[in-house]
A protein has these predicted regions:
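Short coil/turn connectors at secondary-structure junctions
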Residues: 15-20, 31-33, 41-44, 64, ...
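Short, charged, intrinsically disordered terminal tails
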Residues: 340-350
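Generic beta-sheet signal
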Residues: 23-24, 47, 110, 324
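Structural signal for interior beta-strand "rungs" in well-ordered beta-sheet cores
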Residues: 148-332, 337-338
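Short beta-strand-to-turn element immediately C-terminal to the catalytic PLP-Schiff-base lysine
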Residues: 36-39, 69-70, 121-122, 158, ...
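Conserved beta-loop-beta/alpha segment of the NTase-like Rossmann-fold superfamily
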Residues: 1-41, 65, 69, 77-82
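Catalytic-core segments of class I nucleotidyltransferases/pyrophosphorylases
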Residues: 45-135, 140
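Catalytic cores of nucleotide-enabled group-transfer and carboxylate-activating enzymes in metabolic
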Residues: 1, 7, 11, 78-79, ...
Length: 350
């Protein structure tokens, strides 16, 4: 329920001078709700619960939303006189209306025209229905603010999320928590963000990220996972099948595909070859890897932390690096290739 509606309800209650006000609504299917009882001139005389209602009363569509406004001193007086003489054997808060009338105070029934806003939730079906209604309102507001949502029925956005103008959300995008997306972004399909900040002009698809920051102009391909405390600076490229955890990636650096980057500090202009891994765990503790600006790490390399790859240096493909690499150096850490000519032919002839 929106705060503006509650404020309107409260102000109407004060204007009425009633001892108790109840917010009501017309329900398409009133089954399970308490019914509002009115006299011949439309004044509220009470509320009857489903199990206590007569056949005629069950045909009433005006229902109790469970939202009341009551003077505090009067409320305690009314509560003292409640009885559990009903089919449920329970004390009904709704009985305060009848008690209020007995004391000569008016009861005001204030009807809202928006049943969806006040629907009761007593089952998982009703919970799903309420979530759908709320999501429709949130994505509708975003579209009114200039966000393009390709399919509102398959895009899910929580209330605290912010999305900038001219951003496009593709189907099966789920934005949760305090996520904030900048302007001119393309998000989705199949993206889930929880507490993620994304700058302007970024394009991300098929990804799961939580508790991290993504800069401006970042591109992310398919099947990537950004874990907590990850920071991708502006114009970083993340390809396919990449996991980044508790790491900072500098401006313009590239993580093209098939990589695990954990507990690392990567400078700007760095290229990480396919299959490169930062080996951060020794079985007991996590250690950090540092890769300085403009370094080039070849494919299928293992960087065993703690280790530093110096500025502008190269790591040859297939290397396992266990020692620091100096600035502008080439590090090669792999077995020397040996060709045994004719070996395969002899092996086949055995």
């Amino acid at each position: 329920m929106e705060g503006a509606e509650l404020k309107k309800f409260y102000e109407t209650h004060l204007e009425s001078g009633a001892g108790v006000s109840v917010l009501t609504a017309d329900a398409p299917n009133p089954f399970g709700y308490g019914r509002i009882l009115r006299d011949s001139v439309g004044r509220v005389t009470g509320i009857v619960e489903e199990k206590d209602a007569s056949e005629a009363q069950r045909k009433i569509h005006e229902i109790n939303t469970g939202i009341y406004c009551v003077e505090m001193p009067l409320l305690f007086t009314l509560l003292e006189n409640l009885s559990n003489d009903n089919a449920q054997g329970e004390y009904y808060l709704t009985d305060i209306l009848a008690e209020c009338l007995k004391r000569g105070r008016d009861v005001c029934g204030i009807k809202t025209q928006d049943f969806d806003m006040v629907m009761g939730i007593n089952s998982r079906r009703q919970l799903a229905q309420a979530q759908r209604v709320m999501n429709e309102r949130i994505v509708g507001r975003l579209m009114d603010e200039g966000v393009t949502i390709m399919d509102p029925s398959t895009t899910f956005v929580e209330k605290g999320v912010k999305v900038g103008r001219d951003t496009v959300l593709y189907p099966f995008t789920l934005l949760e928590g305090e996520t904030e997306i900048g302007e001119d972004c393309v998000i989705g399909p199949n993206v889930r963000f929880t507490n993620v900040t994304v700058g302007h002009g970024s394009s991300i698809q098929f990804a799961y990220a939580h508790d991290c920051r993504v800069g401006n102009g970042v591109t992310m391909g398919c099947f990537n996972h950004l874990r907590p405390h990850t920071v991708l600076s502006d114009h970083v490229k993340v390809g396919n099948f990449v996991e980044v955890k508790n790491s900072t990636v500098g401006e313009g650096s590239k993580l093209p595909h098939l990589q695990y980057i954990g507990d690392s500090d990567i400078g700007s202009g760095v290229n990480m070859g396919c299959g490169t891994i930062t080996v951060n765990y020794d079985g007991k503790e996590k250690h950090r890897t540092t890769i300085e600006d403009n370094a080039f790490v070849g494919c299928n390399s293992n960087l065993v932390a703690p280790v530093t790859v110096g500025r502008g240096s190269y790591v040859a493909a297939g290397s396992t690096i266990t020692k620091n690499v100096p600035e502008d150096a080439l590090a090669v850490a792999r077995g020397k290739q040996v060709n045994l000519e004719g070996w395969a032919k002899k092996h086949r002839e055995k």
